[in-house]
From Swiss-Prot:
Matches recorded under PANTHER family: THIAMINE-PHOSPHATE PYROPHOSPHORYLASE (PTHR20857), THIAMINE-PHOSPHATE SYNTHASE (PTHR20857:SF15)
Residue positions binding Mg(2+): 76, 95
Protein's name according to its UniProt entry: Thiamine-phosphate synthase
EC supergroup of this enzyme: transferase
Co-factor requirement: Mg(2+)
Annotated residues for binding of 2-[(2R,5Z)-2-carboxy-4-methylthiazol-5(2H)-ylidene]ethyl phosphate: 139-141, 171, 191-192
The reaction(s) this protein catalyses: 2-[(2R,5Z)-2-carboxy-4-methylthiazol-5(2H)-ylidene]ethyl phosphate + 4-amino-2-methyl-5-(diphosphooxymethyl)pyrimidine + 2 H(+) = thiamine phosphate + CO2 + diphosphate; 2-(2-carboxy-4-methylthiazol-5-yl)ethyl phosphate + 4-amino-2-methyl-5-(diphosphooxymethyl)pyrimidine + 2 H(+) = thiamine phosphate + CO2 + diphosphate; 4-methyl-5-(2-phosphooxyethyl)-thiazole + 4-amino-2-methyl-5-(diphosphooxymethyl)pyrimidine + H(+) = thiamine phosphate + diphosphate
Keyword Magnesium recorded: yes
Recorded name of the encoding gene: thiE
Phylogenetic placement of the source organism: Bacteria, Bacillati, Bacillota, Bacilli, Bacillales
GO terms under biological process: thiamine biosynthetic process; thiamine diphosphate biosynthetic process
GO MF entries: magnesium ion binding; thiamine-phosphate diphosphorylase activity
Binding positions (4-amino-2-methyl-5-(diphosphooxymethyl)pyrimidine): 40-44, 75, 113, 142
Length: 212
């Protein structure tokens, strides 16, 4: 069951985002202990795991998230999400149409990326629980990221979607979080600000203060 409070501090990562001095299990464990509200497994890019290795890691992370009662979302990979019993799936505009797999995910969380008003107008949100809007600012975490749309895009979308849950993503850090929240976001998605942090617990504590 989806609760928009899950979006408050939504951590996204895969092995490609992790510094060599640590492991994804260690990073996600510390993030969970520190208070993230949802986790998305996004295994993409150079050196990303595939096949059985990807599935094995996904199962470990799923179990870890459930230890902390935090929803575990899979990015794009509908087959994997279905196979391991993930709590949900997040897809982009170029991925499979939501209505194609929505039947398989009844009772699960479905997220969709939207970057602008045109994408909103052509998206069927009937089966979608939340939309991810961005990138807010320039980001280095995604090789395929669009140009920044800024927090003002959230304000524009709010005029169309009313109270529909929105999570902001892209280049968000402790300093600009309040600006994003004031624009109308229900929460923030974070990758590198957590994975590259020297003190994950402290970073997450600051984020949680700023999303309130």
């Amino acid at each position: 069951m989806f609760d928009k409070n899950n979006l408050k501090l939504y951590f996204i990562c895969g092995t490609q985002d992790i510094e060599s001095k640590t492991t994804i299990i260690d990073v996600v464990t510390e993030a969970l202990e520190s208070g993230i509200t949802m986790f998305q497994f996004r295994e993409k890019g150079n050196g990303a795991l595939i096949g059985d290795e990807k599935e094995d890691l996904a199962r470990k992370l799923l179990a870890l998230c459930h230890d902390y009662a935090v929803p575990f979302i899979v990015n794009d990979d509908v087959a994997l999400a279905n196979k391991i019993g993930a709590d949900g799936i997040h897809v982009g505009q170029d991925d499979m149409d939501v209505k194609v797999f929505a039947e398989q995910f009844k009772g699960k969380i479905i997220g969709l990326s939207i970057s602008n008003i045109d994408e909103y107008k052509t998206s069927n949100l009937a089966h979608v629980d939340y939309i991810g809007v961005g990138p807010m600012y320039a980001t280095t975490s995604k090789d395929d990221a669009n140009l920044p749309v800024g927090p003002e895009m959230i304000t524009k979308l709010r005029a169309h979607v009313n109270h529909f849950p929105i999570v902001a993503i892209g280049g968000i850090n402790v300093e600009n979080t309040r600006e994003v929240m004031q624009a109308g976001a229900d929460g923030i998605s974070i990758i590198s600000a957590i994975t590259k942090s020297e003190n994950i617990s402290n970073t997450i504590s600051q984020f949680l203060q700023n999303v309130e």
